[in-house]
Amino acid sequence: RQAIKDNLYQSKFPMQGKALRDSMQQTKEVLGASVLNNGFDGNFPIGDGQPLFSTAHPIDNGTVANTFTVQADLNETSLQDAIVAIQRFKNAAGLRVMTKPQKLIVPAPLQWTAERLMKSEFRVSTANNDVNALYTTSAVPKGYRVNQFLTDDDAWFLLTDAPNGFKHYEREALET
């Protein structure tokens, strides 16, 4: 307490300050990733009583899905299927909401697959000279980001331009 009052904390305990800052930053990352890590778990429902990622979000005329019925590994076909599904999203009234994918979020083990899918000019793992439509059309314009705090090594996520998508608020910023 004396060190804090006399502003000696940084000179007397330099490593503890850095460790505390790093620990707080990691805590924020873990909490942020927990939204995705728990997104399929029925024990963490959102406002409609379903998990964040569900094939049965209730709307006025039935249900709508924001995930595959059977989860798929990240590859060209599954990414294209997800993009088409996003473009066909419906709101509670059953109207198309005109969303587009913006960014692919992957765990560390999928970063190599994401790099090949997103940045290869030609189709991945084919002998043909076909163009990579994901690349040439900028289907995911903000590319991909590796989140080291995702706990499922084969889970991947697409963020969209939906106006009320993921938001992060800091009630009070960290002080340094």
Label every model-predicted segment:
Residues 13-16, 30, 37, 116, ...:
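General N-terminal targeting signals
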Residues 29-48:
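Short, glycine/acidic-rich hinge or "gate" loops at secondary-structure transitions
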Residues 6, 38, 46, 54-55, ...:
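Generic structural "secondary-structure junction" signal
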Residues 51-92, 98-103, 109-176:
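Sequence/fold signature of self-assembling virion shell proteins
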Residues 1, 37, 106-109:
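Helix N-cap / beta->alpha transition motif
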Residues 1-23, 30-33:
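Flexible, glycine/threonine- and acidic-rich loop/arm segments that mediate assembly and lattice contacts
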Residues 14-28, 80-83, 87, 118:
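Short, well-ordered alpha-helical packing segments
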Residues 3-4, 43, 51-52:
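Residue-level preference for alpha-helix termini and adjacent loops
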